[in-house]
Amino acid sequence: MHFDVLQRLSLAGDAMKPNEDAALAEANAAVVFDGATPVSEPLMPGRSDAAWIAQFGARRVMAHLKEADTPRAALRHALADAERSFTGLRRRAPRQRHEWPYASMMLAVPRDDGLDALWYGDCALLLVRPDGSFDSIGQAIAKKALEASDAARFAKATNTAPTGALDTMQFLELIRSARNKLNATGGTWLFAPMAKASEHVSHARVAAPAGSFVLVCTDGFLALAGDYRSYTPKALVGAAASKGLVTLGAELRALEDGDPEGRAFPRFKKSDDATALLLRLA
């Protein structure tokens, strides 16, 4: 089978900052990347190391898939490409792990009987079959709930609005501490310019017939079915097909504009970058 690419959407969370998401889709594959918000000075040329790793990763994964690589081989080669590019172009070597560029990823590749999904972090794949059955791939919903709980707790402890946390040194140090545990033995692994990250990707094989709708998205878009509870995950796929991604993007931003401090819906950013691809298996 192949993908019919129906719709695409990618919205920056802040018009004054780079969009640190990336997405590409063709008949043979679809991928979204969500660059992790930088917490140190950039090491690469350009405004954002997070935007670099997301865009580079998306391009290289898709390029290797076009060369008929298997999904795992394409990922392995893309990570090796990223390691070489980072080593060659960076201003200096990272001193601590929080200085590395990281990204979440969801890669979907169609098969004769459904699709393969490979992922890091908190991007999501939602699938609705013609008979109405539903699958959710990844841990994004659970991670969004945990982040909302953390935002509410941090705001209470510091007597600040949740969306003000990013401006505090206390929060920055917490994030750096968490990042220093990434891509290490026993820790969480994300897409990064480290070839060995290919050994730690999550994988699922999903059986689905032609006519199934597939929504691949970053957690910023998934907030409609997580933080803001506007839709169930399954209903979000239906809304994408019936209303369109542009309309859903407008709904997302309207909710955030109505709660700029994150008090009704606790979160660390007023608006996150939000990216989605709507596909159909054919």
Question: Model-predicted segments: where are they?
Answer:
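PP2C/PPM-type serine/threonine phosphatase catalytic domain
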Residues: 1-282
